[in-house]
Amino acid sequence: MLYSLLYGYFNINLFQYLTFRAGLGFFIAFFLTLFLMPKFILWAKAKKANQPISSFVPSHQNKKDTPTMGGIVFVFATIIASLLCASLGNPYVLLGIIVLVGFSFVGFRDDYTKINQQSNAGMSAKMKFGMLFVLSLVVSVLLSVKGLDTFLYAPFLKNPLFEMPTALAVGFWVLVFLSASNAVNLTDGLDGLASVPSIFTLLSLSIFVYVAGNAEFSKYLLYPKVIDVGELFVISLALIGSLFGFLWYNCNPASVFMGDSGSLALGGFIAYNAIVSHNEILLVLMGSIFVIETLSVILQVGSYKTRKKRLFLMAPIHHHFEQKGWAENKVIVRFWIISMLSNLVALLSLKVR
């Protein structure tokens, strides 16, 4: 809106620069989240929209009155900033907004059910998976219709591994959406544990998206060019800004939790960025913390079902370290460090190809 008005009608040249609009979107989303979150916290406390705490984590029982669904606020702030600063005629922007709103809605349904039932169960697994699957499939098909190429790239290699048939590509993209959204959801168990690794991952992906959308940079770095995808940089920076605003209230001890409303939206948008920038495989490194958390759950369940033994004291793995006596802050900061280092290595693949 603001972009179309100031550049399209008044020809204010500053708004033609993607980096300026992305920076502006960052600060709009950041300050809007800072402004709205206290009001949301007061409303959520009045409505008793609190996060049910598992009885298996006694050290977290002091958090039982902490409101949840804070993800609604930072997703809303991101959408507002994107509407103001991004080009709404760009299909990647529109699909990015659909991803954020759609995945956040599924998360909201799950959060609402948990609050109403005062249980961690939420929606049935079939219902939740079904909604996420349909949403992922719709977005993946739309990407295919848009003409996104189906080459599969590996980190540090300039040439693609192979070209996937359309049906295989769509199925693979659906898998990426489902994996990333659930992985971030599993990670969101300690104050700030999901938000900061999400910031690192989104920042890395936004750089890849910017390069992919810039003809000169993509040619120089031997990176696959994706026409029009650079505009997604604006939404990514806006989401990072809103996450910083959220972290202001989510740092330990948290005043609010993001809930599934936020974690599913983050995972879905991270997956979307990875897909359109051809970083599906590299996402394993960028989202290393999310991968580790998910694998710990898979291994724990698999071990118990096959051997009746647990590999970890508790899963996801951040609870394992808590059970071993690590302070919550120690677990959080160490996981942040791993995430930061993983993303620095991932960024090296831009130049080392």
Swiss-Prot record:
Protein's UniProt keywords contain Membrane: yes
Keywords: Cell cycle, Cell division, Cell inner membrane, Cell membrane, Cell shape, Cell wall biogenesis/degradation, Magnesium, Membrane, Metal-binding, Peptidoglycan synthesis, Transferase, Transmembrane, Transmembrane helix
UniProt KW Nucleotide-binding keyword: no
Cofactor(s) it depends on: Mg(2+)
GO BP annotation list: cell division; cell wall organization; peptidoglycan biosynthetic process; regulation of cell shape
Subcellular location(s) per record: Cell inner membrane
UniProt xrefs under InterPro entries: Glycosyl_transferase_4, PNAcMuramoyl-5peptid_Trfase, PNAcMuramoyl-5peptid_Trfase_CS
Top-level division of the source organism's lineage: Bacteria
GO cellular component term of the entry, any: plasma membrane
Catalytic activity field: UDP-N-acetyl-alpha-D-muramoyl-L-alanyl-gamma-D-glutamyl-meso-2,6-diaminopimeloyl-D-alanyl-D-alanine + di-trans,octa-cis-undecaprenyl phosphate = di-trans,octa-cis-undecaprenyl diphospho-N-acetyl-alpha-D-muramoyl-L-alanyl-D-glutamyl-meso-2,6-diaminopimeloyl-D-alanyl-D-alanine + UMP
Parts of the chain that traverse the membrane: 24-44, 66-86, 88-108, 129-149, 160-180, 192-212, 229-249, 256-276, 281-301, 330-350
Membrane topology: Multi-pass membrane protein
Xref: Pfam families: Glycos_transf_4, MraY_sig1
Its biological purpose: Catalyzes the initial step of the lipid cycle reactions in the biosynthesis of the cell wall peptidoglycan: transfers peptidoglycan precursor phospho-MurNAc-pentapeptide from UDP-MurNAc-pentapeptide onto the lipid carrier undecaprenyl phosphate, yielding undecaprenyl-pyrophosphoryl-MurNAc-pentapeptide, known as lipid I.
Record-linked PANTHER family: PHOSPHO-N-ACETYLMURAMOYL-PENTAPEPTIDE-TRANSFERASE, PHOSPHO-N-ACETYLMURAMOYL-PENTAPEPTIDE-TRANSFERASE HOMOLOG
UniProt similarity note: Belongs to the glycosyltransferase 4 family. MraY subfamily.
The protein's name in its UniProt record: Phospho-N-acetylmuramoyl-pentapeptide-transferase
Naturally occurring in which organism (per UniProt): Helicobacter acinonychis (strain Sheeba)
